[in-house]
Every structure is written in structure tokens, then in C-alpha cells.
Amino acid sequence: MSVAIRPARTSDIKAIRTIIDTYSLQRRLLSKETVMLYESVQEFFVAEKDGAIIGCGALHVLWEDLGEVRTVAVNEEFRSQKIGHQILTAIIERAKSLGLKRLFCLTFETEFFGKHGFNERQGAPVEPDVYQQLLRSYDEGIAEFLDLESVKPNTLGNTRMLKIL
């Protein structure tokens, strides 16, 4: 049976949690509290095969024209089957439909994101007034995006990448 990419539901959170835990133990993804997953369920897409959730990814809107791709991961046994590409494509399409013009990610998978038009970037690509507004966020991902001292060295040592839509 084929893989379906769809918006996540609250009933998917336990499976998303399992996928995240696998990669966070390997220090390839940031761990997230379960409550944060429920709070952000509307940001997630999942890959479903035969009724099982085998992958996930999220789009987090940061600003009027800027979003972050978060938590793109596929169960190990289903890697190298283009499922991550399908998830990322759904995220990019959603970003465009929301009117976003730029997407960024923090990743070790630079080749994967590069195939989708993301390029390595140093520093935060926002104007000073937007930077000041983003400083008010308590979101750890935004702190890493802004390259704040409080999260240095970069929590995982990953690469900041940006895609212009």
C-alpha cells in the first residue's frame, strides 16, 4: 500500500513522540515535551502507511513571511523511500499557501534539504525590528534561529539553512 501524507491529528501524537524519541536519543532531533506536541499538532504532517504513522514533519510560522521546518523524521525502516521528501514537499506547499516567502531549518541533513532548494546561512535573516519582536518569544527554536547566546553552542551543532519560496 502507498504512503499518504496528511495533516496530523491528536491521535497521532503518540506515534510522533516515538519517532522523535528515536532521533533525539541519537542527538539528531531536539526532544520535545508531549504537551508541546499536542499544542502544536496543527503544525504537523504525518506519513501514514497501512494505518501506521511512519514519519512526521512540522511547519512553524515565525513571522509574516518566515517559517521554520521542524521535526522532519521517518522511521528507520522506511528511510531511503522518499517519504521525507514527500513530507517536506507538503510542508513547503503549506508554507506557500500561507503566504510565507522564506523557510529555514536547523539540520544535520544538509544534502536532503539542499535537494529542496535550501542553502546554508549564517546568522538570522531578518530585519532588526523583526529580530527585536522575535526576541520576545519563549520558543527554543526561535532562540536558535536568532543565534542567541543562551543557546550557544548550537544545541545539536547542526546547520542553519534557508529557502526562498
Describe these PLM feature segments.
Residues 126-165:
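C-terminal "cap" of GNAT-fold acetyltransferases
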Residues 97, 101, 107-134:
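Conserved active-site alpha-helix within GNAT-family acetyltransferase domains
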Residues 80-93, 105:
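Conserved acetyl-CoA-binding loop-helix of GNAT-fold acetyltransferases
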Residues 12, 65, 108-109:
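A generic "binding-loop/recognition-motif" signal
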Residues 72-79, 108:
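A short, internal acetyl-CoA/4′-phosphopantetheine-binding micro-motif in the GNAT/acyltransferase core
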Residues 31-44, 49, 55-66, 70-73:
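A conserved beta-strand-loop-helix scaffold within acyl/acetyltransferase catalytic domains
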